[in-house]
Amino acid sequence: MKLVLFLNMGGATNLQDCEVFLKNMFNDPYILGIKNRFLRKFVAWIITKARVKAMQENYKKMGGKSPLNELTQSLCDKLNLKQDEFKFDFVNLYVPPFATEILQKYTLNASDEIILFPLYPHHSCTTVTSSLEVLQNEISKQKIQAKVKTIDIFYKNELYNEMIVSHILDKKSKFDAKILIFSAHSLPQSIIDKGDLYEKHVNDHVEILKEKLKDHFDEFILAYQSKLGPVKWLEPNTSDVLANLNDKALIYPISFCIDCSETIFELGMEYKHLAKCDYDLISCPNNSDEFMKFILKYLSDLN
């Protein structure tokens, strides 16, 4: 068996899971860099209690749940129906399904393979490193003898970028804008200053896509969303860009593969009230045929 596990932070599937998500996220040492785990757990509890009600209110506006789990499950189901070389499943970091339960579903021996596929095109310790570490620890804990392969960044992949360009131009044919905003999830500047590659990878990716789209847009803007707290984060903020823009724009969520609260609520709803300009949002790759084509080709090239 070749078991491919998509890795993501996850999204709450009900209002109760909002607290689970926040508690686990802020207890992640790659997110909240407090070395003492007891102190980190206490601070995570305080932050969770302060934020959970607001998060639940936001989720109510999306129908009470994030679409991330359903979309990822659909992606796995479609890939499993399309071929029989790989078995696809997914693991979340902060809400179910967790690594323990997913790995226990399968009987794996030394002749099998596990391919860990973080659904993040750019590397960051807060996403890729954290996800891989949790999975590798659980594989070791369960004494699974299968060979383990890991996938890191894929933002340079030609097929992946062809898909992005196709999705952008398809949306542009319905909403003719001359400005394209690439919105990436922000990170605290302190994490970047410690050597995290995320900002560099995002900048590189934007340059790749600008070259492919230069004949279709007059202006490209890279902005960062989802800032939390008083510390310095990557800039400019997507909300500030939209508040100061007067012309029509398209937004592509460049750091996301699957739609989630950050895209559906934050970009699609919350920022609408802040924006001066008329803008439209391009969906993430999700369970699209083009994304599946990229995934299968990428995996076949590993062998």
From Swiss-Prot:
It catalyses: heme b + 2 H(+) = protoporphyrin IX + Fe(2+). One of its GO terms (molecular function) is metal ion binding. One of its GO terms (cellular component) is cytoplasm. Pfam families: Ferrochelatase. Pathway: Porphyrin-containing compound metabolism; protoheme biosynthesis; protoheme from protoporphyrin-IX: step 1/1. Fe cation binds at H185, E262. PROSITE patterns: FERROCHELATASE. It comes from the Bacteria. GO terms for biological process: heme biosynthetic process. The keyword Lyase applies. InterPro entries: Ferrochelatase, Ferrochelatase_AS, Ferrochelatase_C, Ferrochelatase_N. Gene3D superfamilies: 3.40.50.1400. Belongs to the ferrochelatase family. Catalyzes the ferrous insertion into protoporphyrin IX. This is Ferrochelatase. It comes from Campylobacter jejuni (strain RM1221).
